Amino acid sequence: AKRLPVTMAEFSRGCVFKCDFCASKITLALGYRKKSPERCAEEVKHMHDLGFKEFMLADDIFTSDNKWAKNVCDEITKTNIDMPWSCSNGIRVESADEDLFKSLRKSGCYRVSFGFESGNDEVLKLFGKGGRATVDQAKTAVQTARAAGIDTNGYFMLGLSPDTEKSMNDTIDFARSIPLDMM
């Protein structure tokens, strides 16, 4: 955290994906719902008015809809509130683009977290990522976020059913090779 006190925010709930390892498809089985960008900005203003100096966004997949995510960032920017925030979850590597990260940064976002899961494309497919996310996309996402001035965090998993010794070593090598600020 950059400033205390910090609070949590949630602009969307649920997930449109059904990754094998994730509990969201069961615990949040009502599907994917998101608030309007205006409502999100109102909540940020309310948190600020309550005395919070920073928030952590807890959405499972903030960037499943880049247009919506950019609109949320634009609405937060319009409030002119100096309130840094981080996205502790929910940045999809396949959705990462320069415009998105510029919007995130402009709105006060200073850190994003990526669920890389594995450094092996075959394991990513077997995990239920469906070929949507690849190791190359993950590398590009980190570079693009960092170029926009955003710190990066990565989540990895080892030892799930499709993993082999080779795929786990691929994941370890991948984690060592990318310039993350946290993992």
Across the structure, where does each feature detected by a protein language model lie?
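Radical SAM [4Fe-4S] cluster-binding motif and immediate context
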Residues: 1-155, 173
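Gly/Pro- and small hydrophobic-enriched strand-loop and loop-to-helix capping segments
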Residues: 183
